[in-house]
A protein has these predicted regions:
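Charged, low-complexity surface segments at secondary-structure and domain boundaries
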Residues: 1-4, 128, 194-198
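Generic alpha-helical secondary structure signal
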Residues: 13-16, 26-33, 114-117, 135-138, ...
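Aromatic/hydrophobic pocket-lining residues that form π-stacking "cages" and hydrophobic walls in ligand
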Residues: 59, 140, 213
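Terminal helices and disordered tails flanking the catalytic cores of nucleotide-processing hydrolases
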Residues: 148-233
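Acidic/His-rich, divalent-metal-binding segments that scaffold phosphate/diphosphate chemistry
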Residues: 2-94
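Divalent metal-dependent catalytic cores for phosphoryl transfer on phosphate-bearing substrates
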Residues: 39-41, 50-51, 64-179
């Protein structure tokens, strides 16, 4: 389902909250740090500053490369950076709790209420279980989050105790999200060591993620494509 997308015509010159401003807030730094400590304790892959930074950067780049408004790119980057802070409370329902935490932080920083609402919606809808790409900002955050598959996310030091999530992430040596604005195609290109994890194992845990990525791409008036070891899937 495609939605109307705003274009970079006549953008406001009023000073607005940026990702740099958000990163400076001590609550943001502490919540991300403690959220990842909780993820480590329960055996999950990395959800700390590395993941937050990558998702913020990719989420910023998607609207920008598609020619959308500059402010949409900035809002996507802020939502991408904050999307997992709800894990500081509990992994369960972290999109909802993260959205509420972001409301408090961004409100204190003086962000416009309409922009806070956009970011809350993006954070609250970023998971494949019950999320939906409600707008371009949310779509960018979803794709950016789900495309961060990489061996560096594995926090378990013992390969003998890897679960399927660890094996699949550990097997991905290279991950790149390619945006082709001319042909309206967004491609997730992975280099996977199939001796560490099979392509079928990848699909076993990532099928629903790829479905929501396809929906997100449609909102951006694009097609989503998965490429593993130079093969289109």
């Amino acid at each position: 389902m495609a939605v109307a997308l705003s274009r970079p015509a006549g953008e406001s010159k009023v000073a607005q909250l940026t990702l740099r401003d958000v990163k400076r807030d001590p609550r943001v730094r502490t919540y991300i740090e403690k959220a990842n400590e909780q993820m480590t304790a329960i055996g999950y892959t990395e959800h700390g500053f590395r993941h937050a930074g990558i998702v913020a950067g990719v989420a910023r780049g998607i609207p920008r490369q598609l020619g959308l408004a500059r402010r949409e790119s900035e809002l996507a980057s802020i939502a991408g950076y904050l999307h997992d802070i709800g894990n500081v409370i509990n992994r369960c329902n972290h999109p909802e709790t993260g959205a509420l935490l972001s409301q408090s932080i961004l409100g204190d920083l003086g962000m416009d209420l309409s922009e806070i609402a956009v970011i809350m919606g993006a954070i609250g809808n970023h998971e494949e279980d019950n999320g939906f790409p409600i707008n371009a900002v949310t779509a960018a955050v979803i794709i950016a989050d789900k495309s961060d598959v990489h061996f560096s996310r594995v926090q378990n030091p013992n390969p003998l105790t890897f679960d399927i999530h660890d094996r699949v992430n550990h097997a991905v040596h290279k991950s790149y999200l390619r945006v082709d604005p001319e042909n309206r195609v967004i491609s997730l290109e992975l280099t996977v060591d199939t001796e560490s994890a099979s392509v079928m194992e990848y699909f076993e845990i990532f099928l629903m993620r790829m479905v929501i990525c396809r929906r997100a791409a449609e909102v951006l008036d694009c097609k989503f494509k998965l490429v593993i070891n130079d093969h289109d899937l």
